[in-house]
Structure formats: C-alpha cells, structure tokens
Amino acid sequence: MEYIYASLLLHSAGKEITEDAVKAVLSAAGVEVEDARVKALVAALEGVDIEEAIEKAAMPVAAAAAPAAAPAEEPKEEKKEEKKEEDTTAAAAAGLGALFG
C-alpha cells in the first residue's frame, strides 16, 4: 500500500510519478524500497488517469452509504445465525471426538 500512497502523494503534489520520485517518497517515509515493486507500479500507472480512477473508486462508497436505515428485525436474524453457528461448532467438536475414540 505504501507504494500506491507514494504515487498518490506525488500526484496530489503535481509531480511526475517516476521510479526515482516514488523511491524518494518511500525512503523519506522510512520504507525499505523494493526496486521491482517500484518499476511495476510506475509501469502500471502509465496512461492511467489517476483523477478518474479516484472518482470511480469514490462513487460506490457514496452510493453504498445512502441506505443507512436498517429495519428493527435484523438483530433477531443475527441471533438465529449465531445459534446455527453454535450448532455447527458443537457438531464439528463431536465429530472430532469420534476421531480420537
């Protein structure tokens, strides 16, 4: 993630995203730089409109946040699921006991 953050920092500062620039940002942050990862990142970002990518990534988050109101029945459903999980765990434990006699 640090490599992507470094490229985003360079982009927001209006700097060109080059191998040397990414290495400099990572080194300044105290990150041990791997040349292969830097080269792969710079190559992957060639021709990518970072602003457009950020906008596309932010859109689903905003859309997903809209349905915040939840019905009051959801906690009851969760309790049923928890009971099923407990039953499954108990059955698994019983099965393991049969293995060891």
Swiss-Prot record:
It comes from the Archaea. Disulfide bonds: none annotated. The keyword Cell wall biogenesis/degradation does not apply. Residues 73-87 have a biased composition (Basic and acidic residues). One of its GO terms (biological process) is translational elongation. One of its GO terms (cellular component) is ribosome. Forms part of the ribosomal stalk, playing a central role in the interaction of the ribosome with GTP-bound translation factors. Part of the 50S ribosomal subunit. Homodimer, it forms part of the ribosomal stalk which helps the ribosome interact with GTP-bound translation factors. Forms a heptameric uL10/P0(P1)2(P1)2(P1)2 complex, where uL10/P0 forms an elongated spine to which the P1 dimers bind in a sequential fashion. This is Large ribosomal subunit protein P1.
